[in-house]
Amino acid sequence: MAWQVSVPELEDRLQCPVCLEVFKEPLMLQCGHSYCKGCLLSLSRHLDSELRCPVCRQEVDSSSSPPNVSLARVIEALQLPGDPEPQVCTHHRNPLSLFCEKDQELICGLCGLLGSHQHHRVTPVSTVYSRMKEELAALISDLKQEQKKVEEQVAKLVNNRTRIVNESDVFSWVIRREFQELHHLVDEEKARCLEGVEGHTRGLVASLDMQLEQARGAQERLAQATCMLEQFGNESHYEFIRYHSTASSAELQQARLLEGAFSPISFKPGLHQADIKLTVWKRLFRKVLPAPESLKLDPTTAHPLLELSKGNTVVQCGLLAQRRASQPERFDYSTCVLASRGFSCGRHYWEVVVGSKSDWRLGVIKGTASRKGKLNKSPEHGVWLIGLKEGRVYEAFSCPRVPLPVAGHPHRIGVYLHYEQGELTFFDADRPDDLRLLYTFQADFQGKLYPILDTCWHERGSNSLPMVLPLPSGPGHLTPSQPTKL
């Protein structure tokens, strides 16, 4: 015969109606219902009237309730060996088979029927256990997810920390290297200044030594002449008169020739003490600038009047327009031309020889700026220029324009672009070791910037001199490394 009930369902049917646990020492009442021996005795003790079966409410005699041996054997067969003994209620000595949802504590069946938990919602321990196991599993799952997130965060923090330390080490190495090179340059300038002072001093001292030697020789000769004259002072009248007439005038004339022979010399090393730091800083500033760029002009951007030569490094405004294709890149109104290479990051320095031109402009322009029609010379239109007008007015094309107090007429202009810092600086570069600041634009550069030269109108030949992009030359320059990114 096949079983129609599973073991879990069978266990549910073998529960005591009082404690809702599997029967312990089951006793059978006259009505046929069975109860745990402990539950039945507890009911009998706590009832003043006749005992009624909690299931069918029939009056029964608990004293004549025999053990339900068959039920006990079934329960014994279902029980696993080694199952722990259930905990018991301290009040009724019955197994803790129920859980009070209100008070959140374990109780026995009598506590739920007769005790302080009589009207509370109670749940079998097995059900509560299953529910709590599910809640615990869900909590563990949530905790594992949170743990995974925290582990990922820890890994990111560790990687971030490692990256910061590595970048710091690299940047510290760069700083040490740069300062070593700066110290080397400072030592070179120090040696140069000292050598200049010492060389100047050697020349002055040599001149003074020569004068001193001449003066001491004259001093000795005068002493000898004086001694000789004093000796003749003791001669007879005739001898004295004879010598005086021939020698004294000659000795006196020689003494007069020595008067004014000494010329005082002042120590002028060409470097004032108060200007040492400024002078050295100017020299160092030139050396720490990036190495000059080797630029060429782009013929496809040149205005038709412009003539390019010497490998596209020289441009001048001609009298006749050149036959050139009309291209979007070409200027058709302003006499401008761009360099063939632009810059969208980093630090760059280049120079432009303007010579004795009476009118010129130079600077940088955004690659997207319009090249058709009159050039809008202002930062708002992506153009940053300085220039000379009518051979006497230097100006920066900002808004509004700014006149520049330029001393003299620079023939060579230096341009320094620091893209990330948004700085475009112009210098008088006639003296390589003494760059003189002309003007600095501050801007938030976007996109590629191109060096631009504007020769201006030739003025019927009076402004036809060329502008030149010179090849880099001269002493080596310290080229600082690009800064590292955190």
UniProtKB/Swiss-Prot annotation:
Zinc finger (B box-type): 84-125
Catalytic activity: S-ubiquitinyl-[E2 ubiquitin-conjugating enzyme]-L-cysteine + [acceptor protein]-L-lysine = [E2 ubiquitin-conjugating enzyme]-L-cysteine + N(6)-ubiquitinyl-[acceptor protein]-L-lysine
B30.2/SPRY domain residues: 275-474
UniProt zinc finger (RING-type) residues: 16-57
Post-translational modification (record): Auto-ubiquitinated. Acetylated by EP300 and KAT2B. HDAC6 drives TRIM50 deacetylation. Acetylation antagonizes with TRIM50 ubiquitination.
PANTHER family reported in the protein's UniProt record: E3 UBIQUITIN-PROTEIN LIGASE TRIM
GO MF annotation list: ubiquitin protein ligase activity; zinc ion binding
Family listed: Belongs to the TRIM/RBCC family.
EC number: 2.3.2.27
Gene: TRIM50
Principal EC category: transferase
Any one annotated GO CC term: cytoplasm
Main location group: cytoplasm
InterPro entries tied to this protein: B30.2/SPRY, B30.2/SPRY_sf, Butyrophylin_SPRY, ConA-like_dom_sf, PRY, SPRY_dom, TRIM/RBCC, Znf-RING_euk
Alphabetic keyword roster: Acetylation, Coiled coil, Cytoplasm, Metal-binding, Transferase, Ubl conjugation, Ubl conjugation pathway, Zinc, Zinc-finger
Protein species of origin: Sus scrofa (Pig)
Function: E3 ubiquitin-protein ligase that ubiquitinates Beclin-1/BECN1 in a 'Lys-63'-dependent manner enhancing its binding to ULK1. In turn, promotes starvation-induced autophagy activation. Also interacts with p62/SQSTM1 protein and thereby induces the formation and the autophagy clearance of aggresome-associated polyubiquitinated proteins through HDAC6 interaction. Also promotes NLRP3 inflammasome activation by directly inducing NLRP3 oligomerization independent of its E3 ligase function.
One example of a Gene Ontology biological process annotation: innate immune response
Protein name: E3 ubiquitin-protein ligase TRIM50
Localization per Swiss-Prot or TrEMBL: Cytoplasm
Entry coiled-coil feature ranges: 125-170, 204-235
Subunit structure: Can form dimers and trimers. Interacts with several E2 ubiquitin-conjugating enzymes, including UBE2L6, UBE2E1, UBE2E3. No interaction with UBE2H. Interacts with BECN1. Interacts with SQSTM1. Interacts with NLRP3.
Residues binding Zn(2+): C89, H92, C111, H117
Modified residues (N6-acetyllysine): K372
Matching Pfam families: PRY, SPRY, zf-B_box, zf-RING_UBOX
